[in-house]
Regions:
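Short aromatic-glycine motifs in intrinsically disordered, low-complexity regions
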Residues: 66, 106-108, 120
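Short beta-strand edge/turn micro-motifs at domain boundaries
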Residues: 87-89, 112-143
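Short, cysteine-centered beta-strand-loop-beta hairpins and adjacent loop/turn segments enriched
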Residues: 97-107, 138-139
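Short, surface-exposed coil-to-beta transition loops
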Residues: 72-74, 110-115
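A solvent-exposed, acidic/Ser-Thr-rich amphipathic alpha-helical stretch
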Residues: 31-97
């Protein structure tokens, strides 16, 4: 197999794992681990508006928990990446389960989310430079 093809396949596999690493970090509330997945000069456009990555990470660190736990279940990302390029785009669907509201009501929520990520190579690894997180649907249940 030519070296260029092997390098591209390695990149695609690393890109495929990026949303999974995000899901595991956010569900575990591993904010330091989460920060490593983003470019420090990046931007996140999400449920709370648009934020530079440092402000987004600080907001997550300071946020009060609403639910006891969450689980992101991801579809396989659609990856756009040209061989040899240091940029790529990921389009990932997710179903996010949020369980047991901390206010004691026991309510749960389930969301359909679409993550659109522009990613770049930085320091030999892929990181998210611009994320758009779009809620496609939301369902809440009482406890």
């Amino acid at each position: 197999m030519p070296d260029a093809l092997v390098a591209w396949l390695r990149d695609v596999e690393e890109l495929r794992s990026l949303p999974q690493r995000y899901a595991r970090a956010i569900d575990a509330r591993d904010i330091d681990g989460l920060a490593l997945l983003f470019h420090p000069d990046g931007v996140v456009d999400g449920m709370r508006g648009s934020s530079p990555v440092p402000a987004y990470i600080d907001g997550l660190r300071d946020a009060k928990r609403v639910f006891e736990s969450s689980m992101h279940v991801l579809g396989d990302p659609l990856i756009s990446h040209e061989p040899g390029s240091a940029t790529a785009h990921l389009d990932t669907y997710a179903v996010v389960h949020q369980l047991d509201k901390v206010d004691g009501s026991g309510g749960d929520a389930t969301l359909g989310v679409r993550y659109l990520d522009d990613v770049v190579q930085r320091g030999g690894r892929w990181v998210i430079r611009h994320r758009q997180a779009r809620i496609l649907w939301h369902r809440a249940s009482a406890g």
